[in-house]
Every structure is written in structure tokens, then in C-alpha cells.
């Protein structure tokens, strides 16, 4: 698991439209990188819609939202369209999730993405880590952590 002050690992992943997105594309901005298990599931929908509803507040704090799950871009596109999600959803890989400590054993749910969020500062350093995230109210929790 990454710690505050660590350099956030670089990645290059596809977005909803198949476009390559790198973490370094966002240097100079704060990044909310949130890992979620699956598109269109109850908790993940609550979490994504709360980020959507608070998006202007994040923009006012020079922050971008990046959602990460291991769903493909077709699934992401349907999820984004269904819920009006205006931020980037990344087609994540197990390798990248492991680098961020967001992949592992979830007990009775088996192995997969563990709901985790990283606040990454303008220079690419981890500013905050949120583990075992509760979907409801998480967006507000993140906003309070942004300076």
C-alpha cells in the first residue's frame, strides 16, 4: 500500500472512448484516483454519482476525478451514459491496481478491486490514502481532505 509522500505510480490506461490516459497528463492538478469494484452495482453507483454531484466543487479546488475499475470501455461507456458521469473512467488492470494496493482478497467476495481512493497532489505525490471506503458520503470526505 502506498503511503502519504510516496510518488504515485505512473500508468497508461484506456478511457471510456479507448483513448490512452496517463497519470502524468494531470500534472499541475490534484487527482482523485478512486478504485471501485464494478460498474452499475449499488455501492459503485452511489459513489460515482456523488462524485458527479460534487464535480464543480472539485474543479474549484483544481482537482480532477479518475474512476478505476477493471471493466472494459463498453461497460464504462454504458455506466457513464446511464448516470451522466462527466469524468474519466479508466479501464484498469490488475497490475496497476496491485501497484496501488487496491487489489486483493476481499474475503467472501474473492479477489478483486478493494474500494480505495488516493488524493494525488499537483507534483504526482500521494497526499492522502482512503482505505475500506464507504460509498455513501465518500465524495464529501474527499472534498474535506482537499486543500
Language model regions located:
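Chalcogenol-based redox active-site neighborhoods
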Residues: 1-147
Amino acid at each position: 500500500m502506498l503511503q502519504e509522500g510516496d510518488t504515485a505510480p505512473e500508468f497508461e490506461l484506456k478511457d471510456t472512448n479507448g483513448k490512452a490516459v496517463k497519470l502524468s497528463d494531470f500534472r499541475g492538478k490534484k487527482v482523485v484516483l478512486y478504485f471501485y469494484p464494478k460498474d452499475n452495482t449499488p455501492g459503485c453507483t452511489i459513489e460515482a454519482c456523488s462524485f458527479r454531484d460534487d464535480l464543480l466543487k472539485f474543479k474549484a479546488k483544481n482537482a480532477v476525478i479518475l474512476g478505476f475499475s477493471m471493466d472494459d470501455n463498453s461497460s464504462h461507456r454504458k455506466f457513464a451514459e446511464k448516470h451522466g458521469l462527466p469524468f474519466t473512467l479508466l479501464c484498469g488492470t490488475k497490475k496497476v491496481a496491485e501497484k496501488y494496493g487496491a487489489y486483493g482478497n476481499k474475503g467472501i467476495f474473492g479477489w478483486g478491486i478493494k474500494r480505495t481512493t488516493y488524493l494525488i497532489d499537483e507534483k504526482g505525490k500521494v497526499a492522502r490514502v482512503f482505505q475500506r471506503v464507504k460509498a455513501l458520503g465518500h465524495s464529501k470526505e474527499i472534498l474535506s481532505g482537499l486543500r
